[in-house]
Amino acid sequence: MYYLKNTNFWMFGLFFFFYFFIMGAYFPFFPIWLHDINHISKSDTGIIFAAISLFSLLFQPLFGLLSDKLGLRKYLLWIITGMLVMFAPFFIFIFGPLLQYNILVGSIVGGIYLGFCFNAGAPAVEAFIEKVSRRSNFEFGRARMFGCVGWALCASIVGIMFTINNQFVFWLGSGCALILAVLLFFAKTDAPSSATVANAVGANHSAFSLKLALELFRQPKLWFLSLYVIGVSCTYDVFDQQFANFFTSFFATGEQGTRVFGYVTTMGELLNASIMFFAPLIINRIGGKNALLLAGTIMSVRIIGSSFATSALEVVILKTLHMFEVPFLLVGCFKYITSQFEVRFSATIYLVCFCFFKQLAMIFMSVLAGNMYESIGFQGAYLVLGLVALGFTLISVFTLSGPGPLSLLRRQVNEVA
């Protein structure tokens, strides 16, 4: 009953829904749009993704700084929303033509827009709503669940619309951005009675200075967290960048593969949403560290499994593993950050460790993976990436702070005894 009366839960849950609906129109089908619509090679696709990562590097630390400095003020979300209103005009009239004119110019312009709106924008949105969740007393994971549903529904719709007229997809995204603006206008995050609570969660602190930044970077546990992110999460994202092209290669035609990819993504994200609802309960019990290790194990299994896939059914099953990984990685990372660091720095740490360092590594790994796809094929490259992710997951058992799997096992044994 409490959640039914919590206005901010519904406002920001719906904000997640429409934001990730737009992101679902872009991210899963972006490689297909590049390859099938614009006829971009795998190597050039790697350059485009590297450019997106490069410009994300410029925005992510800035967004982390601003998010902690602004606290519960909505200025940054207004800018992101305004940019998303231009989603269709950008893809149709600017990005696509520029890629045909010059791949480097197109990559730079696309990198700026996509890096701002999604690669830096998505974690900034998540960090802001995580602050609101602590202030408004609702579980972040349950609000984030709406984003999974939005992504799922969009993937199914886009899978059909994309094969009819890909431009419809982009106009749908711009329309959803207008709904974001309405939700953001009516959302209230600055009620005077909550000022004390906001201060308690660090939302109203001016959180950044050179001295504070140096103090954060002197902590070994921040670097060990970054090691996990680069070795596991970054490797997985590189694997997932061109997975749509790998997936569609198992079908008789690209159109059939694209439609099935949309249906499978929808099914996976709906299951993802159901798991996201219960994830906070599980993660509160096992702890942030074990949640990250579990996510790393699932990611490694999916990547390595893809290297041995020989049929469409196998890649469908492997695709659905994504539904287990996202809740434990996303909710687990915030639980880990708020348990191991000062909560007033949560956005800065999230956007630096989980986003900035990841994008820095992806500049090099995207190009390397693109070259591997050309030289040894998708499956050979996936085996290499999977072993890398698995290796860093095992290392993180010893380097991440907090109770690990053995401590959890001992606690379970003691409870049974």
Curated annotation (Swiss-Prot):
Example of a GO MF term? carbohydrate:proton symporter activity
Q: Which PROSITE patterns match?
A: LACY_1, LACY_2, MFS
Impact noted for substituting A279S: No change in transport activity
Record-marked site positions (Substrate binding and proton translocation):
E269
Q: Which domain of life is it from?
A: Bacteria
Q: Which Pfam families match?
A: LacY_symp (PF01306)
Regarding the membrane, this protein is recorded as: Multi-pass membrane protein
Q: Where is this site: Proton translocation?
A: R302, H322, E325
Q: Which family does it belong to?
A: Belongs to the major facilitator superfamily. Oligosaccharide:H(+) symporter (OHS) (TC 2.A.1.5) family.
Query: According to its UniProt entry, what is the function of this protein?
Result: Responsible for transport of beta-galactosides into the cell, with the concomitant import of a proton (symport system). Can transport lactose, melibiose, the synthetic disaccharide lactulose or the analog methyl-1-thio-beta,D-galactopyranoside (TMG), but not sucrose or fructose. The substrate specificity is directed toward the galactopyranosyl moiety of the substrate.
Q: What is this protein called?
A: Lactose permease
Organism field: Escherichia coli (strain K12)
Question: What gene is this protein translated from?
Answer: lacY
